Amino acid sequence: MAYMDMNDNIDVSQVIKDAFIKLMDAKDDIIKANKIDIKNNNGFKLDFNFIKDIDKKLMCIKNPYKKVENDCDKFIINDSLGTICTIYNGNTYYLIELALKSILTRNSMIFVSNVDYMDFTNRLILILIKDVLEKYEIDKNLIQLLYVNEFDSLLSNSVSINRVFVIGDRGFQHKVKIASDIDVITFGINHYDVYIENIDDVSLIEKLLKLDYCDIYVKTGSDLQFDDFIEVQDIDEAICQINFNTSGFSSIIFTDSGYSASYFVNNVKTNNIYVNMLPNGMDLDFDLNLFFKKKKIICHDVMMDKLFGGSYE
């Protein structure tokens, strides 16, 4: 699990580009692996349009490594963290984006899960990415996948892990935080908190019920009926419960009241808020800054020019 240095002369943007080309060229094989996971009731049908969206997003990123910012009396430089441990549920989209972002930022990444969800699909995708790494003479162990029953020993004893990402609901996040002696960054991706005052579009209700992970809060007196919905007296109670229980990722409100919409937006504590709309299922939000440590350099501008040739913002 040791962190491997990557040659500074390697064009990581080209590595990422080649990785996406490799994935697209192997589309038929990936589909076959995906069908095995689906047949085993151990996965979802992969949408290659989502993978193309990740490609477009990453290709727009200019090489952020060693980027220098002029911050008044000091200069701040991006440097790689080392090894990032990502504890997640096996979602292939997360694996692709996080693996390639770790390469882009010159980090190594260990994916850890206590379930083998999407196992055939994920293993094949990692093999394809590792093939590209070897083409550039980069250690293929830069990206690893581990299955463990418990995270405690991994997180409490490893001195080679520099940061932990955890993707899951609030309870899962808390479990990892307790077990870890390392800095933990939490993501509540694809966990939605929904408050319904009223909703007229039947198609939205049908789509809402297809969301994998959501808590639905319905205002008292509503004619709507959902399995396992939570009844609340008003918007204040809904916001209070959401803020207490939320994983912090996304919340949704359905209402025809401008006041309620505004009140919800201003008071609910989630990163993404949808008003009378549903997410598209690909709201990945892995901030690239989380893959770096910031180094402060204190010196005169003249010396900074010598160090970086005036190439800083």
Model regions and ranges:
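N-terminal Rossmann-like NAD(P)+-binding subdomain of aldehyde/semialdehyde dehydrogenases
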Residues: 1-74
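Short, well-ordered beta-strand elements within core beta-sheets of diverse protein domains
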Residues: 2-5, 226-234, 248-253
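Short hydrophobic alpha-helical runs that function as membrane-insertion/retention elements
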Residues: 108-112, 165-166, 184-186, 193, ...
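C-terminal segments
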Residues: 15-18, 25, 32, 49, ...
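ALDH superfamily catalytic-core signature
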Residues: 18, 22-26, 104, 130-135, ...
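A structured beta-alpha segment of the ubiquitous adenosine-cofactor-binding alpha/beta core
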Residues: 71-76, 143-161
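Conserved small-residue-rich beta-alpha loop and adjacent elements
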Residues: 52, 60-131, 136, 173, ...
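Short, structured coil segments at secondary-structure junctions
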Residues: 105, 160, 179-180, 268-269
